[in-house]
Design a protein with these regions (language model features):
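A short, Lys/Arg-rich alpha-helix, primarily the initiator
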Residues: 1-27
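Short alpha-helical DNA-recognition segment
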Residues: 27-50
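Short amphipathic recognition helices of helix-turn-helix/homeodomain-type DNA-binding modules
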Residues: 73-83
Length: 83
């Protein structure tokens, strides 16, 4: 893990992010199928869902597109603040 990734993971609750990713996946998709949709393998998706890895910006954007949830919500569980 790079220094930047370590700093980010220290400030974010990776387990909570993982729970939100699992919520986005829902019960109708397997990790294999959802991973394919995101362009990643089942092992990497599992690491995200278990809070063992920080999702890349590319994956966050794909999750946002798929779920129509904000990246703020995916990372923090909060709605984005209005400008």
């Amino acid at each position: 893990m790079t220094t930047t990734a370590k700093n980010i993971s220290a400030r974010l609750d990776l387990k909570a992010i993982g729970r939100r990713i699992r919520e986005i996946r829902g019960f109708d998709l397997t990790q294999v199928d959802f991973g394919r949709m995101l362009g990643i393998g089942q092992t990497q998706l599992s690491k995200y869902e278990l809070g063992q890895s920080v999702p890349t910006v590319q994956i966050l954007l794909r999750l946002k597109t798929y779920s129509r949830k904000s990246i703020d919500w995916i990372l923090t569980g909060e709605k984005p603040q209005a400008d």
